[in-house]
């Protein structure tokens, strides 16, 4: 009985497959991570490391996820905001307020976790796509390599030791602790790595002003413009290769750089290359 039942199962699947009625599981594409560039800064606002320090509960049982942003050159702690989760809808307003207050950095350096990045091509996420629209380079450190953001991690250890052991009684009280720590860290505490100076003595606001309205991308005349569909695909000749649903409705640029090889560009960011013969996309960082 078992063998007959199994044979019947195979026959049914063969029939469904023959008539294209059988949904096959698609293997999820994994993208190689080429690693982050070394950090070299000689003035403020070239690179801002950012991260979520590990979550914890305040005394009333509410979760707190501290979002932190520093300036690599001066070591200044630009923001430390306790949030109830790591959702983009909560993190993006913190970055927007910071950009409005002090301007834009050249680059933001993070790990590969939410909401900063995803497992898709170029780690595209709603947050880093917004950064690209603002002309900010997103540097993603190598997975499981926190030492590539080591300076920021050392600040986190001090933050944890001085503000969360034990945690405050409520999120509001915890935020007050964060603000006290930030003032001391920036204004009172000399740092050996910057010649025993304080971060606030070296840091200055950025000259790059946050634009309230983001201009659409403008590509050179030789670049072919394609709009990403709601399904995350774009047109290449008669084909519709998949790119990313994060970019749905956005205009990308296709630049032919070889025999049937095209660069895929979004604003000034090279997302990858596609071979028009195989439709295989090779990602970049």
Locations of the language-model features?
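Short beta-strand or tight-loop elements
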Residues: 45-50, 65, 239, 248-250
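A short, conserved beta-strand element enriched in hydrophobic/aromatic residues
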Residues: 50-100, 106-115, 141-142, 265-267, ...
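Short loop/turn motifs at secondary-structure junctions
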Residues: 6, 103-104
